[in-house]
Regions:
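Short, flexible segments with low predicted structural confidence
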Residues: 11, 89-91, 113-114, 137-139, ...
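Conserved catalytic motifs of the protein kinase core domain
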Residues: 10-11, 71
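Residue-level detector of family-conserved "landmark" positions at structurally sensitive sites
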Residues: 2-3, 77, 106, 152, ...
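Active-site beta-loop-alpha junctions enriched in small/polar residues
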Residues: 6-10, 18-19, 79-81, 110-112, ...
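Conserved metal-phosphate-binding beta-hairpin within the catalytic cores
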Residues: 1-7, 13, 76
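Metal-dependent phosphodiesterase/phospholipase catalytic core, i.e.
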Residues: 17-126, 145-154, 167-169
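C-terminal active-site rim and adjoining tail of enzyme catalytic domains
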Residues: 50-53, 128-212
């Protein structure tokens, strides 16, 4: 699974995609301006999904505890592209270590400095650069900064021969967000490391068909 992590006002890592709570709660404002207690008082998307009317914004620790027994791999995106939360890298690394999941976590971010910082904190961790625009010699750039993978946008890899270049780099290549069947089949056939999608059931079925 892929999830996004930010810090509350009191420095607790929470799992939420947007930098604000406007879209998913009845309140407005930045995640960073609410304490964990204040966020826990809110319900998430209760009007859109009444069957989950008690849903809350989870902490990263809660999510790791929930998936730990499953053996599933977790891709943690550090949401530091707009606001770089102080010490988020260390806080997240500490929680992953506490959960005993160091071997099952991938760290990624659009803020490449944040990923480089994570690599300094946990040199053995698997890391990847997220990006949507063209970065010249991106594979060389990743290797020179000791980063292990590339996470480009699907519309990016469809341009020119970028995918061929990335696959030839021996770096892990995970493409986002792949929601179209044709794109899924193309990338699975190309043997990318993984695809990031909102429709995992569809992707799993296409992968099974490709392996049949």
């Amino acid at each position: 699974i892929e999830l996004d992590v930010q810090l509350t006002k009191d420095g607790i890592p929470v799992v939420i995609h947007d930098e604000t709570i406007d879209r998913v709660t009845e309140k407005k404002g930045w995640v960073k301006d609410y304490t964990l207690k204040e966020l826990k008082e809110l319900t998430v998307l209760k009007n859109k999904f009444p069957e989950y009317s008690a849903a809350k914004i989870p902490t990263l620790e809660e999510v790791l505890d929930a998936v730990k027994a499953s053996g599933i791999q977790v891709n943690i995106e550090l949401k530091t592209g707009i606001y770089w939360y102080p010490e988020i890298e260390q806080k997240v690394a500490d929680l992953v270590k506490k959960a005993g999941m160091e071997e099952r976590v991938i760290y990624s971010s659009f803020n490449h400095y944040s990923i480089q910082q994570m690599k300094k904190i946990v040199p053995e961790a698997e890391t990847a650069y997220l990006y949507s625009d063209v970065i010249l010699n991106v594979a060389e750039y990743a290797k020179n900064t000791k980063v292990d993978g590339l996470h480009p946008a699907v519309y990016h890899v469809k341009m020119a021969d970028f995918l061929k270049e990335y696959l030839g780099s021996n770096l892990n290549v995970r493409v986002w967000t792949v929601n179209e069947k044709a794109d899924m089949k193309w990338l699975i056939d190309a043997e990318v490391t993984a695809i990031i999608t909102n429709y995992p059931d569809m992707a799993v079925q296409i992968k099974k068909e490709a392996e049949a």
